[in-house]
C-alpha cells in the first residue's frame, strides 16, 4: 500500500544540492517539429498533408533515415521498439527522439551545462531531421499548431495508450483531441536544490507562465484562417482537461507548498495503469481513490505515482525537475531564446529575486485573465495595470543585463526582432498570411519557404558569439 509520505519523498529524492551553484545548474530542452509531405493526390505538387504513421514515407521511414544519417556524421542512435515497430530513438548520453500522438517529432535532449551545447544539439536535430525527410520531399514546420488540417487529416499514433486518451478527451474538454494531434511546443526543464527551492521557483514560474506564452506565441492560424489567438496552441490547452491542465489557483499562491501540488495530483485520475501486460483504464478513479482501494485489481505502487505525474499537463509541471511547458514551438533560430531567457531569469539569484518581486506583487486573482489574454492577444494584451509588452521588455532587459555576449546572443537577436517592438513570432506569421491575400495555400507556400530559409541559416551560421 502506497502512503502519502512516500508521495512527498518522491520530490525529496530528486533534489539536487549541486543546483545552488552555476556549475551544477542544468538545462533540459525539449523541442517539437511538425512535418508535412506532398499530397500524392495533387498532381500540381502545391499542396501538402501531415506526415503519416506508416511506411517509408511516414514516421517509421523518417526514424530509420534519421538513425542512418546520424551514423554517417558520427552520431549513434539506437532504435526503441514496441514489438516490431520502430517508435523512437535514443543515444547513450540520454537524449531521445520521440513521436507524439499526431506524428510530431520531438527532441528530448540530455541535461546540458551551457547554452552553446543546447544550440549544438538543436542544430544536429534540425539538420538530421531535414536529411531524413528529404527523400520524401518533406518539409519541417515550426508552428505551435497545425495551421490547415482538420483532425481527420492527421493520423493518430498506433500506441494503445494514445487511443485510450483520444477517446477520453471529448468527455473532459472541447479541444483535447486537437491537443494530441495538432500541437507542437517548446519545453525547458530546470533543477531544484531542495523542497524550499522547488516551492519558491515553482510559484514564481507559474506566475511567469502567461508572459512566456505571450512572448513566444507562434500559432495564430487554424483551419486556414486567423484563429483570433496569437497562441492557438495555448488556447487548445486551456480547453483540454481542467483536472490535469492549466494553472490552479493554489500554484500561484504566496503560500504554495509541495503539499498543494500533491493534493492536486491526487484529485486527478490516471488514464490507465499496466498490470502484468494488461492495461486497466482508470478514468473513473482519482489517484486518491486508488490509494484508498477503489479498484479491486489495482494496488498502487511508487512507480505508479511517478507515471501519474508524467500524465498531468499543467503549464508548469513538477517531476524530478521543474518542466516549463508554456511556449509554442519556434523556428530553430528563435527557439534558443527560450533557454537563454529562462536560464538568466531563474538560475541567476540576483535576477530571480527581482523577478520574484515583480511577479509576487501582481494580484493572484488576475492570473486566470492573464493566461486567457496571453493566448489571445500575445504582447498586445492588457489586464488592468499590466501591459504585456512593457512587462515582457522588462523581463528581457533584466535577463540580458546579466548575460555575457556568448550567453545573450540568441536572446538579444530575438529581443531585437520581436519583443522590443511589442510583437511575437505569431505577428510575423499573420503578416505573411495577409501578404498572401488570405489564401491559405498561397500563405502556406510562403510560410514553408520562410521557414526553410531560417532553418538553413541556423544550420549554416551559428550565433557569432557562441562558444
Regions found by a protein language model. Give the residues of each.
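Terminal catalytic/cofactor-binding subdomain
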Residues: 1-174, 182, 334, 338-347, ...
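Structured core elements
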Residues: 34, 187-189, 323-325
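A very general structural signal that marks isolated residues within well-ordered alpha-helical segments
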Residues: 39, 193-195, 211, 330, ...
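Loop-rich catalytic cores of soluble enzymes, especially ATP-dependent carboxylate-amine ligases
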Residues: 112, 134-141, 145-317
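Conserved phosphate-binding loops in nucleotide/dinucleotide-binding enzymes
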Residues: 117, 193, 197, 326-335, ...
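Long, well-ordered mid-to-C-terminal structural blocks that present hydrophobic/aromatic surfaces
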Residues: 283-366
